[in-house]
Amino acid sequence: MPQLDKLTYFSQFFWLCLLFFTFYILLFNNNNGILGISRILKLRNQLLSHRGGEIRSKDPKNLEDILRKGFSTGLSYMYSSLSEVSQWCKTVDYLGKRRKITLISDFGEISGSRGMERQILYLISKSSYNTSSSRITCWKNIMLTHVLHGQGSIIS
């Protein structure tokens, strides 16, 4: 914007006022503007302060219902995932038998404490050992091992 001179002073002042008044009308005098948002926030705070006692009295039961629904949803999701993985393992095993190769034959879970790690690893290696002449392209068993005491993890 050039410096204000006597020839363009009026037009610059006119456009400056027009822009500022337009922004003022859009921001402050409209219900969706800044003043409208502040009115909505004040009303919301008043409603929450009046209903605060009711919400607190119903909170434990609602919280228990929410937790129960969340746990049941998580449990059903876990079981559906487990059934899908088991179905996938069966399908892969069936396809492997048709092609005369061993791919995946089992999906299981072993739970134990940290003291049982060596025994679990021995059982996994013993069950996945194959003496036949067919080539093994993947582990025979896929096992999820959970260590109860949380001191370490076993991945197989």
UniProtKB/Swiss-Prot annotation:
GO terms for molecular function: ATP binding. InterPro entries: YMF19, YMF19-like, YMF19-like_N. GO terms for cellular component: mitochondrial membrane; proton-transporting ATP synthase complex. It is an enzyme of class 7 (translocase). Pfam families: YMF19, YMF19_C. The chain crosses the membrane at residues 8-28. Its EC number is 7.1.2.2. The keyword ATP-binding applies. This is one of the chains of the nonenzymatic component (CF(0) subunit) of the mitochondrial ATPase complex. Belongs to the ATPase protein YMF19 family. F-type ATPases have 2 components, CF(1) - the catalytic core - and CF(0) - the membrane proton channel. CF(1) has five subunits: alpha(3), beta(3), gamma(1), delta(1), epsilon(1). CF(0) has three main subunits: a, b and c. This is Putative ATP synthase protein YMF19. It comes from Triticum aestivum (Wheat).
